Amino acid sequence: MEKIVSLCKRRGFIYQSSEIYGGINGFWDYGPLGAELKRNIKELWWNTMTRQRDDVVGLEATIIMSPQIWKASGHVDTFSDPMCDCRLTNKRFRADQVEPQDGIVYYFKGAFNMVSEEFGFIEGEKEEVEKYLKQKREIDDLKKLAEELSVSPDQRKQKIGAAILEFTNLKKEIKEPFSVLLPPGKPPEAAFVVAGQFYEKRGMECPWPIKSHTEKVTGDTRHNPENGAELTEARPFNLMFKTYVGPVESEDNVAYLRPETAQAIFAQFKNVLETSRQKVPFGIAQVGKAFRNEVTPRNYTFRSREFEQMELEFFIKPDEVVEAIKGHVTPGAELDTRHSTLDTSSWGWEAWHKYWVEERIRFYESIGLPRNTLVEYWQKPEELAHYARATVDILYKFPFSKRDEKGELTGEELEGIAARSDFDLSQHARFSGKPMGVFDEELRAAWGKLDEARKAGLSKRYYEARLKYLTKMGVEAVKAEQEAREDAAGLAKGQYIPHVIEPSAGVDRLILALICSAYSEVAETDDKGKTETRVILKFHPRVAPIKAAVLPLLKNKPELVKKAQEVRDQLRPWMNVFYDDGGSIGRRYARQDEAGTPFCVTIDFDTLGEKPELKDTVTVRYRDDGKQERLGIGELANWLLPKIR
């Protein structure tokens, strides 16, 4: 990762925010190449998810919204991470991300001040006392030593023994428990050093920790992996950035920077449905900034406090509605999503969930992430959010990912695809008092044709699902049963609350994954036998920041420069082009390889007609293998466009 981080700064992909003032942790700026890469990714996602589909429309919502939205979504009360602090350094940790450790825990019950003015030392005695104190850490051993010294025929040793006895009985002490974990192989003295630093910070001039006992532990997460010091008890830390709307900072004016883009989509669901002339199933997509006050931002841009999301909320019919209309629900296991034309009319939530998982993996492959670098991880039941029926995380094998028992990278999350049931729309209906259900004429007509047994069975299933949700949300039992019955009765009228499938991806994580995947090194030996390592970023042309570089062979030949500028201007309306005339042609190729530019277009003397048959042609060099071919200037744009789109 160090090489990638260095390259990103050196070539203008990513800078630390506010770097001239020391930086600010968890915030990053995108330089010229990074900004282009980011724009390309967002546009490709938007085109794939909205413009190339008839069933998805877009939304762009504000970053600050009514705080009631975050109350309804649960973010105000539950959007938190467990946080703990190192009791020695005050460094903060995510309690659930502390690395497990094995070793021996040393428990201390407090500390004495090792040197006291009450001793009344004679000259040279203080140093002798300190020498003995440092040798014997256990208080009982120290008392035993003092007793031995006090009966020594050497009067000086008698005085030292008396001074130590006086020390052990002093009242200048701290009775504050503390513990230190030592990994295997570390000497016990190291625990006393760390404990001494802890008690020194609590006002003791020269603390002498008092050990109570030790304990052998495995998989311990109660101590700082960096220094072994004890961590505080975990406590919830809300991740939302709080601010105020208007000139008065009062609780009435509290607002939050949005921690996700999804909730605005749910809040605007009815408006979009009514104005876009869509029908369920359909989706609403949004790309935008989100903010989370992470306890410990880590792994470069992977976990940041300001980031960008690409989210789709795809609204579908509940299974009971699908079954009422079509007579059955297509099992997800039987679904083959590779066909371009699919009959989705009988799809339930499992089929739609599987479809979106496979669609998203195909997207990642289409922009240059090999399938063998991706992991499809199905969350276990105990890992699911309370509202989710199923969630699949698409993981990428970053260099910093953990390794399994076989030594294989396990991957870190790029995107989650969650089947969120009807939780979100139901919550906003409850908190806003506004209906979030839809009317479906097809359902109303189909319901009237069902026999009574079928109606009763479907109504019962819908009632039980709604009752489960209402009970989980703390609605009083009698009221919950009444509301659930009313919801079930709504099926006969063609009314229901849509369910949601949510593919949610992080732009910044995807950028980092693409850079990691594209990074490669090539060792080249020159004519003098000197070997040099070059970096090539093998971006897929679709995402590459610069699509083509236009290079005149020589800078000091005006006719070459003029023709190169004409070629540049011809390509600019169609793609991002970079013009470079500085340095040897080999060095310019190397610079473009490092920037990830897939094509270099060289204007040479043959372009000008030195060889008449090659006039108005250029050399096009491909980044990954260095191969070149000759093309006419007039056909250049048409040759490049299919390769970069």
Residue ranges: model-predicted function:
Residues 1-645:
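NTP/phosphate- and nucleic-acid-binding module
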